[in-house]
Amino acid sequence: SAQNPDLAHSVTTEGTTAILNHAVRNGIERFVYFSTAHVYGAPLVGNFTETSPTNPVHPYATTHLEAELAVDAAHDLGEILGIRVRLSNGFGRPMTYEAADWRTLTSDLFRQAVLEKRMEMRTDGLQERNFITKTDIARAVRHLIELPQTQVGNGLFNLGGSQSQSLLAMATTIQERAQSKYSTEIPLHRPEPTTADIQHLNFDIHKLLNTGF
């Protein structure tokens, strides 16, 4: 999306709006849109709830926020029950090797561990991120589809894991799992830290949890 912001706008903003309008015209009752936590800004450092101000700095985040606004407007007008989900970092086994996005941290490190029996991080790993399994994402979709209208409110929910952790902690977990599975040492390399400070992230999901998720 950074290389082609016009395409990002066409696919994410205009594409979502077209599907939304089609749903409204055909009497669909509920529309669940998956946005991104990056609408709050980048890098994500600090505390974020659904009432936190948005500050998208990348076409990926900007176009998702634009699509959110279309869903929000239809929801406010009573045209459809519009639910917007701001997702943190999903991870898990891809359906196929070709369908996976191997650029993400977890997928890249898993791939390295399996194919190269070594892992190389691009950063020192002290930044915190919020991770959620694809299984829990699927569970959230079902929950939001079945959620009583009285609990939907304005339709905006953060979706992530119960707590954030550093990229290094996630990488170490992957390393330990891979070493156990393959019964061999898998070294983990990373650039030397330039500071001892961890950039903390609190991605608050209590609003969704309070609906029974």
Predicted regions mapped to residue ranges:
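NAD(P)H-binding glycine-rich loop region in Rossmannoid oxidoreductase-like domains
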Residues: 1-11
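Conserved cofactor-binding/catalytic machinery of classical short-chain dehydrogenase/reductase
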Residues: 7, 15-18, 30, 52, ...
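Hydrophobic positions on the long internal alpha-helix
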Residues: 15, 19-23, 67-71, 140, ...
